[in-house]
């Protein structure tokens, strides 16, 4: 019996990619993590009786913050929310909406991933709420990707402008998220466990912040009178390192000021691009630094969503559509153009083989970087658009009739643009040829957006209210 014709590759690309993103949307993840009724509250397997609890403080930051906070209020219900909840969450400006008791504060404009004065104002409010915690209160911290830029709280001697300058320098120099956040933590009162230490009635204990606890029940009495802090985390970092996601506001920071200085040295940081005050503060801190004591076991950090969850859901959808799935993992990093060329070569290898059945779907995740040059900075684009454009250069001579690929940020953002990423198929290539667009020229200028916009290759989703790095789908028919 003959197989019916496959649907257009573009339709399948979008269906598979969307299935991955839908699986990590904040409301879905929150419903899996939190359950509540009139008698009790359960968070990631740990249960408290409402009769044992005072206030429920909700604080946090990130691109998924609005979705997480809104879902939490729905789970709790209006009566409990009105009686128990007070909260403040810093989110991108385009995510702000009205909730009953949790303030969603615009900590930065959409598409501007750096600290702002509005973010600083919100961070001070978050610190105030944290310090007001009583032994009978419970604190839920909602953390997701983008939280670092949304939680600026400079240490003494550093201004907000200094933080902005060092952030811009490292991002434009190709620093990894781990390197960027290592420096951010050493310049912040919130990051690197600072928020946990700000929580009222929390004392230094004998157990690390990321140590799992068995469900205890019995409310906060089981915590020896200390405040209970539970961080619900949607990871946007390869390997889910708790100290790097949003710069670990509730996780012990084991890095040192000297490591931050070494990172700045690696990228050739110096005044005026990085203010002298940054070096002065780090040098002074390095001279008096000693290994920190562990945070108490009354602080719990739980990853409720990550890139692997998105990949799994995308794979399931691909199988439904009749594809054999090959997963290339969630840890694809490196320079975006190189990652794109390698993905294209893998597509060609799959097309050339006769030992494995087709159609095939290649899935991968991660977060590559783009090295900007002085001439590239005014252009428009992002890492995913750059990746797909590089793949086109590798594939254009081989033909694209039976190959298509898509790379997009699960947060709906790709660089300082309104696109989540880009897709490539024969239609995009043919349109580029008809417009006489040279992909190599646009790639060298880091201007991929201007290439894909007239070709119909941009992936435009708007904010997805989640963030688990990037998701890439390649189809070979």
What are these regions, as identified by a protein language model?
Residues 1-57, 66-79, 113-135, 304-310, ...:
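N-terminal glycine-/serine-/threonine-rich phosphate-binding loop
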Residues 59-61, 88-91, 140-145, 171, ...:
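Short beta-strand segments
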Residues 71-81, 101-104, 154-165, 202, ...:
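A glycine- and small-aliphatic-rich helix-loop capping segment at beta-alpha/alpha-beta transitions
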Residues 88-135, 178, 183-184:
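Glycine-rich oxoanion-binding loops at beta->alpha junctions
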Residues 135-139, 147-208, 213-246, 254-260, ...:
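Conserved phosphate- and dinucleotide-binding cores of soluble alpha/beta proteins
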Residues 158-176, 253-269, 375-405:
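Gly/Ser/Thr-rich active-site loops/lids in small-molecule metabolic enzymes
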Residues 199, 204, 213-216, 224, ...:
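Accessory alpha-helical/coil subdomains and C-terminal extensions
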Residues 384-477:
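Internal helix-turn-beta structural module
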